[in-house]
Amino acid sequence: MAWKVSVDVDTCIGDAICASLCPDVFEMGDDGKAHPVVETTDLDCAQEAAEACPVGAITLEEA
C-alpha cells in the first residue's frame, strides 16, 4: 500500500530530522523546509519521521 506524505510548510521549522531519518521520502527545499519527494510504501520510515518532527508538520494518509 502506498502512503501520501504531506508537510505543512507553514509549520515546518526546517529541523531536517525527517530528511535524515527517511531520505528516500523527504528532501530539504531551497526554502529551508522539508518536502516529500514521493509517495512511499515504507510506512515505518515515514511514521518515524512524522513522530520525530518537533512541530508535528508531517501527516500521512493512504494514497
Swiss-Prot record:
One example GO MF annotation: electron transfer activity
Bound cofactor: record note: Binds 1 [4Fe-4S] cluster which readily converts to a stable [3Fe-4S] form.
Cofactor: [4Fe-4S] cluster; [3Fe-4S] cluster
Disulfide bonds: 22-45
Organism superkingdom: Archaea
Keyword entries, A-Z: 3Fe-4S, 4Fe-4S, Disulfide bond, Electron transport, Iron, Iron-sulfur, Metal-binding, Repeat, Transport
Ranges where the 4Fe-4S ferredoxin-type domain occurs: 3-31
InterPro entries: 3Fe4S_ferredoxin, 4Fe4S_Fe-S-bd, Fe-S_cluster_ET
Repeat recorded as keyword: yes
Keyword Metal-binding: yes
Pfam families: Fer4_13
Residues the record lists as binding [4Fe-4S] cluster: 12, 15, 18, 53
PANTHER family hit by this protein: FERREDOXIN (PTHR36923:SF3)
Function comment: Ferredoxins are iron-sulfur proteins that transfer electrons in a wide variety of metabolic reactions.
Protein name as it appears in the record: Ferredoxin
Organism name: Thermococcus kodakarensis (strain ATCC BAA-918 / JCM 12380 / KOD1)
Gene name of the record: fdxA
